[in-house]
Curated annotation (Swiss-Prot):
<protein>
    <recommendedName>
        <fullName>UPF0210 protein PTH_0987</fullName>
    </recommendedName>
</protein>
<comment type="subunit">
    <text>Homodimer.</text>
</comment>
<dbReference type="Pfam" id="PF05167">
    <property type="entry name" value="DUF711"/>
</dbReference>
<dbReference type="InterPro" id="IPR007841">
    <property type="entry name" value="UPF0210"/>
</dbReference>
<comment type="similarity">
    <text>Belongs to the UPF0210 family.</text>
</comment>
Length: 452
């Protein structure tokens, strides 16, 4: 039975500590939309998305009113378009992205993910066509997000794909240069990508998923920060327990909202992603949680240990609260979307190298990082390769969302607004890795991939 104290505590979390449900994401299988005629395939895609997701936004708003919990985003993920459009007789898949954009606008969601390809072991003809279409697709749409998986622990790293994505990211930045290269903010390169991730820009509906499903992403850095503040001076055991109990409460809310949405929409409930997702709002920062633990500034020595403790405690609390935890489920550290991260980068405490180290113990890693516009594609590819290596060796998801900001240099800023925020342009190493990334082929899977 709920106590009055628990009710008051929940109200405080929402009103004073920025607790919200970050996203309700409907995953939709588009495999039955395949058709050799590209126009027919696009029509099937539009019709299916608008039919299944037509009430998604309305349902989310009903749940907000019913429970008094803000649901910030209602989103859609679909089967990777490289799979759906494989049989189509067309050389350019950008029209499929525009169809997704139209469908997303029709149902009122702010993002739709799934303009994606899975190429960790090699390319199909459709994969080539989709990847070549990414810059145009992201430059001519507002709501479409794209992702490419280039590595897995079982397959190793497809360095041909890594090298190619360096050029694709660069071209995407150039085509959206008039908007601070925002196209790159909607493009993620993954290793060990999850198939049930509700968060953008990396969401897609995996081939092992059901016909339609509801996945939920929670938030709550502000709630965790205030809990950590109450444990000032306590030892690490007490600190971890404090975070764990708070994560339990946050995840319970996510599960309640997810199951309610699934029931109202008549589709299965999938997972709760328990990632701590920051926003640019004051007090809604993962970096500030780490600083409340005793760091003068996020990025200083000790940051990796603090983030490891935070991430582990969140997972333990979340796993106790729900039997269906999935997606990325860790702490996000997107520089442009976290006010504390931005301050740390401005102060010189948080560097690209430190963010790479933090990848080892958090959810994604190099996320929403602006780099100089003249950064060579080979350097971008090398950064992707470093992140992918961390992922495959440690059997975890890693990802890169870099913005080579056209016309900008280190110390300048890019401004995206909204949840994407603003970011200082961070310097990269001036030395070339071109000869290395141009070798091609696959970096073999690590020995710890042999688990049978």
């Amino acid at each position: 039975m709920l106590t009055l104290q628990e009710v008051v505590e929940t109200i405080k979390m929402v009103q004073e500590e920025n607790l919200d449900i970050r996203t309700i994401t409907m995953g939709i299988s588009l495999r039955d939309c395949a058709d050799p005629n590209p126009r027919a395939a696009r029509q099937k895609i539009y019709d299916k998305i608008t039919r299944l997701a037509g009430n998604l936004v309305k349902t989310g708003e009903e749940i907000e009113r019913e429970y008094g919990l803000p649901i910030v985003n209602k989103r859609i993920s679909v089967t990777p378009i490289a799979i759906v459009a494989e049989s189509c007789n067309t050389g350019n898949f950008a029209d499929f992205a525009r169809t997704l954009d139209e469908a997303a606008a029709a149902v009122g969601v702010n993002f739709i993910g799934g303009f994606s390809a899975l190429v960790h072991k090699g390319f199909t003809a459709a994969d080539h066509r989709l990847i070549d279409s990414i810059p145009e697709a992201l430059a001519t749409t507002e709501r479409v997000c794209s992702s490419v998986n280039v590595a897995t622990t079982k397959a190793g790293i497809n360095m041909d794909a890594v090298y190619r994505m360096g050029h694709i990211i660069k071209k995407t930045a150039e085509l959206t240069a008039d908007r601070d290269s925002i196209g790159c903010a909607k493009l993620v390169v993954f290793a060990n990508v999850p198939e049930d991730n509700p968060f953008m820009a990396g969401a897609f509906h995996g081939v092992g998923e059901p016909e339609c499903v509801i996945n939920v992403g929670v938030s709550g850095p502000g709630v965790v920060k205030n809990a950590v503040r109450t444990a000032k001076g306590a030892d690490f055991g007490v600190l971890a327990e404090t975070v764990k109990k708070t994560a339990f409460k946050i995840t319970r809310m996510g599960e309640l909202v997810g199951r309610t949405a699934a029931r109202k929409l008549g589709v299965p409930f999938g997972i709760v992603d328990i990632s701590l997702a920051p926003t640019p709002a004051v007090g809604d920062s993962v970096a500030e949680i780490l600083e409340c633990m005793g760091l003068e500034r996020c990025g200083t020595h000790g940051t990796t240990a603090a983030l490891a403790l935070l991430n582990d405690a969140v997972k333990k609390g979340g796993a106790m609260a729900s039997s269906y935890v999935g997606g990325l489920s860790g702490a996000f550290i997107p520089v442009s979307e976290d006010a504390g991260m931005i301050r740390a980068a401005e102060a010189g405490s948080l560097t690209l190298d430190k963010l790479e180290a933090l990848t080892c113990v958090c959810s994604v890693g190099l996320d929403m990082i602006a780099v100089p516009g003249d950064t060579p594609p080979e350097t971008i590819a090398a950064i992707i390769a470093d992140e992918a290596a961390i992922g495959i060796i440690n059997k975890k998801t890693t990802a890169v969302r870099l913005i080579p900001a056209a016309g900008k240099k280190a110390g300048d800023y890019v401004e995206f607004g909204g949840l994407l925020g603003r970011a200082p342009v961070m310097p990269v190493k001036p030395f070339s890795a071109g000869e290395f990334v141009r070798r091609g082929g696959r970096i073999p899977a690590p020995i710890n991939s042999l688990t049978n």
